[in-house]
Amino acid sequence: TSIFETAGVGQPAYATIGAGVVNTVFTLVSVFLVERAGRRTLHLLGLAGMCGCAILMTIALLLLERLPAMSYVSIVAIFGFVAFFEIGPGPIPWFIVAELFSQGPRPAAMAVAGFCNWTSNFIIGMGFQYIAXAMGPYVFLLFAVLLLAFFIFTFLKVPETR
């Protein structure tokens, strides 16, 4: 909700509900696409889309004072970010980890993946407000750079596992 408030959205609670709806819908979309498009392709698409949305969000926040309509662009960027997350980086890593490892080491690999996932979520959740206060409207560029790095890593190192 605070992200929507920063973006100048008049009713941030409704926008937050909208983000939840987008999250749910695109989780279902991912279920149907994963076998057709492939895990690696969806993961790359999701990372690229999230990176683009993070850049769009930065631009919208920078122009918000001069162009109040940028609050709508911010909503589109956030909804797009959530949608691309649910198409790729949300569910796909769990498929990849499960399919990269044979039956014996799979539980340990899944445990390490879960630990890394929840530790990262905790760090972002606890630190975002501080990073946002320090970086201002450029906070989403940090995410864009990280997403670009993850895209390059996935492109170069992660095989298709279906």
UniProtKB/Swiss-Prot annotation:
Record membrane topology: Multi-pass membrane protein
Extracellular-side positions: 1-13, 65-75, 129-135
SUPFAM superfamilies membership: MFS general substrate transporter
Name of the protein described by the UniProt record: Solute carrier family 2, facilitated glucose transporter member 4
CC terms in the record's Gene Ontology section: cytoplasmic vesicle membrane; endomembrane system; insulin-responsive compartment; perinuclear region of cytoplasm; plasma membrane
A Pfam family this chain is assigned to: Sugar_tr
Free-text comment about domains: The dileucine internalization motif is critical for intracellular sequestration.
